[in-house]
């Protein structure tokens, strides 16, 4: 490369670094008593530290020990962030929604996926989120989800016939992702053609791989690939929405898309295409990443722990024996899966499918003796409580009994958030996990082929080799 170009690039890097250093110092000087911590490298923040840490859990705990067990500052995804820790931090964030804090999503997620609305501002994301919550809470109530259980069971059976039964060895993670996304396409959009599902799922891989990265849009970066994938998802999903609106009178399905099209607010206003798109996207992201990760690690622990598998098998076989030939699962069957759900919760405690969630400070406030300025982003982390021996004795031990009775103390087990921002898809995820567990456990025993498989962390934890197992049919 030409020496002049190299010199120019070096000079530009130094200039940009100094700009961000002085800009950060000036901004920080306006507030006293900020949370302790580090902003890391200019532009990159502590993203490199996070990436080279063996896990997000280690990253969080090292800084809790070094700075504060209640709140510390860092810089991730191009933002100054206050990480709230422990039960007090969780309670504070969950209790101050729309008082001190409001919804915020990283640009690396919103730009590739969110559809611009008429107002086209960060506020539009917040408005959509509020609409999303109210609408989704209604349609995702347990009484409204009952109708989905037979469909989930039927699709799980078909999935096993095609992807599991013909083989002696399978990779769990990619198969579960395929199942959960196909199920979402069927229930949300009434799409069951494999080729049509693939037109959505392939670009989704690009989007989810770049969702929580530094938003640098240069060729070859994860963020750049996410934007390209997002454009393909947007084009395909918008085409589906417009076609459904045209043919809605002849459509007799009661899927999510139909409900979104017919939904109106208290003023009689219907959603526009962008709002419909954004609501669907939220559920597709959750079903593709977090739920599939949860199911994967439930099966991982069932493969590793024969005693746990046997107890789940007993419970599920009691249900199976009560069913007629070909009879599908129903709501009453799900309610009997108490031990199975305790097992799922313990797997989620040890290997949370989502790390936490972001908020934005809408005013200056204090917590733990520190000031969090307006405009800063906040984050609550599952890793600050899920393995705390104060709340979970012998935290590395797999013990489903922790969830018997009233279960863990409030604000200690938080994979679905809490307060007004409790994940509205929690019940949907519970049904999906339990239905899949039932179909696996009543059909197969699992043997891991890579005993100490490495776990890598993206938006969710991922087994490096896809969790390959040998499957043994149960007679």
Swiss-Prot record:
GO terms of biological process kind = pentacyclic triterpenoid metabolic process
- What top-tier enzyme class does this entry carry? oxidoreductase
Instruction: Name the coenzymes or cofactors required.
Output: heme
Q: Which residues bind heme?
A: 423
Q: Where does this one sit in the cell?
A: Membrane
Q: Known InterPro entries for this protein?
A: Cyt_P450, Cyt_P450_CS, Cyt_P450_E_grp-I, Cyt_P450_sf
MF GO annotations: heme binding; iron ion binding; monooxygenase activity; oxidoreductase activity, acting on paired donors, with incorporation or reduction of molecular oxygen, reduced flavin or flavoprotein as one donor, and incorporation of one atom of oxygen
EC number(s) in its UniProt entry?
1.14.14.64
Q: In which tissues is it expressed?
A: Specifically expressed in roots.
Q: Where are the transmembrane segments?
A: 6-22
Q: How does it sit in the membrane?
A: Single-pass membrane protein
Q: Which reaction does it catalyse?
A: beta-amyrin + reduced [NADPH--hemoprotein reductase] + O2 = daturadiol + oxidized [NADPH--hemoprotein reductase] + H2O + H(+)
Of the GO CC terms on this record, one is: membrane
Q: Which UniProt keywords apply?
A: Heme, Iron, Membrane, Metal-binding, Monooxygenase, Oxidoreductase, Transmembrane, Transmembrane helix
User: A single Pfam family, by name?
Assistant: p450
Statement: the UniProt record of this protein carries the keyword ATP-binding? no
Give disulfide pairs as residue numbers: none
**Annotated family:** Belongs to the cytochrome P450 family.
- Name of the protein in its database record: Beta-amyrin 6-beta-monooxygenase
Organism whose genome encodes this protein: Solanum lycopersicum (Tomato)
Q: What is the lineage of its organism?
A: Eukaryota, Viridiplantae, Streptophyta, Embryophyta, Tracheophyta
Designated gene of the protein: CYP716E26
């Amino acid at each position: 490369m030409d020496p002049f170009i190299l010199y120019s690039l070096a000079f530009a890097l130094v200039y940009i670094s100094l700009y961000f250093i002085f800009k950060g110092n000036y901004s920080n000087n306006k507030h006293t008593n900020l949370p302790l911590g580090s902003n890391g490298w200019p532009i990159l923040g502590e993203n490199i530290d996070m990436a080279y840490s063996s896990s997000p859990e280690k990253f969080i705990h090292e800084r809790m020990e070094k700075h504060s067990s209640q709140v510390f500052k860092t810089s991730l995804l191009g933002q100054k962030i206050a990480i709230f820790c422990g039960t007090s931090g969780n309670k504070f964030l969950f209790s101050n929604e729309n008082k001190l804090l409001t919804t915020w999503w990283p640009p690396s997620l919103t730009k590739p996926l969110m559809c611009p609305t008429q107002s086209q501002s960060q506020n539009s994301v917040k408005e959509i989120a509020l609409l999303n919550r109210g609408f989704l809470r209604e349609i995702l109530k347990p009484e409204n989800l009952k109708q989905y259980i037979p469909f989930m069971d039927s699709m799980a059976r078909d999935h096993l016939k095609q992807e599991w039964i013909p083989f002696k060895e399978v990779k769990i993670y990619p198969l579960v992702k395929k199942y959960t996304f196909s199920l979402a396409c069927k229930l949300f959009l009434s799409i069951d053609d494999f080729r049509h599902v693939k037109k959505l799922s392939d670009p989704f891989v690009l989007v989810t791989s770049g969702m929580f990265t530094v938003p640098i849009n240069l060729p070859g970066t994860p963020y750049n690939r996410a934007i390209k994938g997002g454009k393909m998802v947007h084009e395909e999903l918008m085409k589906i929405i417009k076609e459904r609106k045209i043919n809605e009178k002849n459509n007799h399905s009661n899927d999510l898309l139909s409900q979104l099209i017919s939904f109106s607010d208290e003023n009689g206003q219907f959603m526009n295409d962008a709002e419909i798109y954004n609501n669907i996207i939220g559920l597709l992201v959750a079903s593709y990443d977090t739920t599939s990760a949860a199911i994967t690690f439930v099966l991982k622990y069932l493969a590793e722990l024969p005693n746990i598998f046997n107890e789940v098998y007993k419970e599920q076989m009691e249900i199976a024996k009560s069913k007629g030939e070909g009879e599908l699962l129903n709501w009453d069957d799900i309610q009997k899966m108490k031990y199975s759900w305790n097992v799922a919760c313990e797997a989620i405690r040890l290997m949370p499918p989502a790390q936490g969630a972001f908020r934005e400070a809408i005013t200056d406030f204090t917590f733990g003796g520190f000031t969090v300025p307006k405009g800063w982003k906040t984050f609550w982390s599952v890793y600050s409580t899920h393995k705390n021996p104060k709340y979970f004795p012998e935290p590395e031990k797999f013990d489903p009994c922790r969830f018997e009775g009233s279960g863990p103390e409030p604000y200690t087990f938080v994979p679905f958030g809490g307060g007004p921002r409790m994940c509205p898809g929690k019940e949907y995820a519970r049904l999906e996990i339990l239905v899949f567990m039932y179909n696996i456990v009543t059909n197969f025993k699992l043997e891991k082929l890579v005993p100490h498989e490495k776990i890598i962390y993206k938006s969710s934890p991922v087994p490096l080799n896809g969790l390959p197992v040998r499957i043994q049919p149960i007679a």
